[in-house]
Amino acid sequence: MNWQDPLVKKFLYLIVAMVILCPLGILLVWNYGDAWGEWGPEDVAEKVGEDKVSGLLHLADIWSYAPLPDYDIPGWDDPFHASIGYIISAIVGVILCVGAYYALIKIVNPKAAAG
């Protein structure tokens, strides 16, 4: 990857801007409950009826590990610290995605990963 390429620089600036702006997602809905689509299985069951989501409720505990559950750092409950937690979560997500991308490139085309 050519870090001096103007397109690469613009892309990196975009990623940095999105990481910095990501706390807006929590601040905009701070007093209004969960953001649209961020519901847990119990919330979905409450909205549409438990009989319609019994499979979802049953399978919800299969994957219980998340590096930063709810984009949060435990104990950081006030809006300022929650915003910092969102930013840290975004940085971790970007690092994991870029790492997965490079690992996949290295597996598929080892010559491309070296250059």
From Swiss-Prot:
Q: Which InterPro entries match?
A: PDGLE_dom
Record-linked Pfam families: PDGLE
- Any one Gene Ontology cellular component term annotated for this protein: plasma membrane
Keywords assigned by UniProt?
Cell membrane, Membrane, Transmembrane, Transmembrane helix
Q: Which domain of life is it from?
A: Archaea
Q: Which residues cross the membrane?
A: 11-31, 85-105
Indicate how the chain sits in the lipid bilayer: Multi-pass membrane protein
Where in or outside the cell?
Cell membrane
The UniProt family comment states: To M.thermoautotrophicum MTH1706.
Report the protein name in the record: Uncharacterized protein MJ1570
Q: Which organism is it from?
A: Methanocaldococcus jannaschii (strain ATCC 43067 / DSM 2661 / JAL-1 / JCM 10045 / NBRC 100440)
